[in-house]
Amino acid sequence: MSLLTPLIWILILLPIILLALIKSEKGQLKYLGFFILYFLADCYIQQLSKQFISIEFMGLKFSWVGKILSLLMSLTIIYAVSKSNRQEIGFTTKTNAKKQVIIGLLFFFGFLFFDLIFKMILFPKGGAFDLETFAFQATLPGLTEELAFRGIGLWLLEKAFPPKWTFKGIKFGWGFIMVTVLFGLAHGVFLTANHELKFDLITIVYLSLISSLSVGVLRKFSGNLIYPILGHNTINIMNAIIRIL
């Protein structure tokens, strides 16, 4: 994947950013710059580590090093900010009201059930069990991506664009929309090393409206990152299980 790919993701997101700038109440726009810098740094840490740090000699095929470095960077930022900011990021064991948590869980599991049926029909079956696949999918992607997207990323964007829509006592805003869409873009758009653009619209729409939206709602209604991390990893494990049925 070309190093230009993360810039393409931001470029595609630009219309939503511009719309947010027009429609939002005045926020602290420096945080939009911080978000872009953080997002690009996270992307390039993972990309460059994959290029320059090989662990194939250990028989491992997934990007363990990149994900661990991403995790370390996120944790460094989280522990560098104040306790109140950590709670805003979602790095806390505190939750919202029980009723709100239940709403988030019902929303997530409703989407998860749809996701299960859809993938049971479409996913190729009969793959071999692979321990590394399960170990990786059950841990690092959910942990690192939730810290990045619905943790630090969402926190920075909500500083830039204060949420103004309220549903069941939970505030939503342009930041929520941006991280939801950006997650889909990061899984459905990439520029190859030969500068060939791959644009999978179905993947972008599906991941944005199903996976990303469901864990995003779970994050907002639960009030912390524990629930979306567990939810994200549940989706990944479910995908791996379906492929070996």
What kind of region is each of these model predictions?
Residues 48-49, 102, 189, 234:
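Compositionally biased, intrinsically disordered low-complexity segments enriched
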Residues 2-6, 27-35, 63, 67, ...:
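Residue-level signature of transmembrane alpha-helical entry/exit and packing/kink sites
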Residues 30-32, 48, 91, 155, ...:
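Generic low-polarity alpha-helical segments
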Residues 20-33, 86-97, 161-170:
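Membrane-interface helix-boundary motifs at transmembrane edges
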Residues 1-85, 237-245:
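N-terminal, membrane-interfacial amphipathic/helix-forming hydrophobic leader that caps
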Residues 53-67, 75-147, 158-163:
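Juxtamembrane helix-loop-helix connectors linking adjacent transmembrane helices
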Residues 6-18, 112-120, 127-245:
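Transmembrane helix-loop-helix hairpins at the membrane interface
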